[in-house]
């Protein structure tokens, strides 16, 4: 079993996954990331004649991920580590 699968299974079973998703949603909204991605989508659509949803997602996703502040990434990682340590006693 890979580490990622272990994290997924552990967080799903313990109900922490939704808490982590809520935290991420709040932090991204607070730093203006949602607005940045919305503008990025508008610019992408405006620059092309026809864009379907799948193509838009493919084009915007890498740029949107790069816009996530390091502080948000670090906070989420710390929360995940704390959950794993608390639940599994995993030494990371």
From Swiss-Prot:
CC per GO annotation: DUBm complex; nuclear pore; nucleoplasm; SAGA complex; transcription export complex 2
Keyword match Transmembrane helix: no
Subunit composition and interactions: Component of the nuclear pore complex (NPC)-associated TREX-2 complex (transcription and export complex 2). Component of the SAGA transcription coactivator-HAT complex. Within the SAGA complex, participates in a subcomplex of SAGA called the DUB module (deubiquitination module).
GO molecular function, one term: transcription coactivator activity
Subcellular location: Nucleus, Nucleoplasm
Protein name per its UniProtKB record: Enhancer of yellow 2 transcription factor
Main location: nucleus
Family the entry assigns: Belongs to the ENY2 family.
UniProt xrefs under InterPro entries: TF_ENY2, TF_EnY2_sf
Oxidoreductase among keywords: no
Domain of life (superkingdom): Eukaryota
Coiled coil: none
GO biological process, one term: mRNA export from nucleus
Sorted UniProt keywords: Activator, Chromatin regulator, mRNA transport, Nucleus, Protein transport, Transcription, Transcription regulation, Translocation, Transport
The protein's role, per its UniProt record: Involved in mRNA export coupled transcription activation by association with both the TREX-2 and the SAGA complexes. The transcription regulatory histone acetylation (HAT) complex SAGA is a multiprotein complex that activates transcription by remodeling chromatin and mediating histone acetylation and deubiquitination. Within the SAGA complex, participates in a subcomplex that specifically deubiquitinates histones. The SAGA complex is recruited to specific gene promoters by activators, where it is required for transcription.
């Amino acid at each position: 079993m890979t580490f990622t699968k272990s994290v997924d299974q552990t967080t799903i079973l313990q109900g922490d996954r939704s808490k982590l998703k809520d935290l991420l949603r709040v932090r991204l909204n607070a730093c203006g990331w949602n607005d940045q991605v919305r503008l990025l989508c508008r610019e992408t659509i405006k620059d092309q004649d026809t864009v379907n949803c799948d193509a838009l997602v493919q084009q915007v996703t890498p740029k949107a991920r790069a816009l996530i502040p390091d502080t948000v990434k670090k906070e989420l990682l710390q929360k995940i580590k704390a959950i794993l340590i608390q639940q599994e006693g995993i030494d990371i």
